[in-house]
From Swiss-Prot:
Coiled coil: none annotated. GO terms for cellular component: cytosolic large ribosomal subunit. The lineage of its organism: Bacteria, Pseudomonadati, Pseudomonadota, Betaproteobacteria, Burkholderiales. Disulfide bonds: none annotated. It comes from Cupriavidus necator (strain ATCC 17699 / DSM 428 / KCTC 22496 / NCIMB 10442 / H16 / Stanier 337) (Ralstonia eutropha). This is Large ribosomal subunit protein uL6. PANTHER family: 60S/50S RIBOSOMAL PROTEIN L6/L9, LARGE RIBOSOMAL SUBUNIT PROTEIN UL6M. NCBIfam families: L6_bact.
Amino acid sequence: MSRVGKAPIALPKGAEVNVAAGVLSVKGPLGTLSQPIHSLVKVNVENDTLTFSPADESREANALQGTMRALVANMVKGVTTGFERKLNLVGVGYRAQLQGAALKLQLGFSHDVIHEMPEGVKAETPTQTEIIIKGADKQKVGQVAAEVRAYRPPEPYKGKGVRYSDERVILKETKKK
């Protein structure tokens, strides 16, 4: 049995779980998320806890049990507290600002980069060189952060570019004669 999958998920106040037609949906103060449940995994909802068990004793069922438990745990956390990723812009003239729901980035190109935010994901710019991406869906928040970083990833000689706030860029030494 999966060690991750064996652990029950405690539902915090304000979170509701519904299982219908092979789809598990979690509703909370920050929205609603749903996830199809694989046929090799059984879900039990008792009081304020969720437990997952494999439908049979195959390796695939054990692996999917842990996967489904982790995905649903992220959904529960997302609809109650939410997820966020912080990005920093490092470089002369690099700045970010919000234009409605879109993010306008000046990253040293001859043009401004406009990044549209998908549904359920919001961006904030506390300063011109900081971006905070928030949302209930962990996968979407991480994907948007990766897309913004991909416009200008940190380069290895000066460290200029868009980086995660907790990212450490290892700088290379320049070529010597």
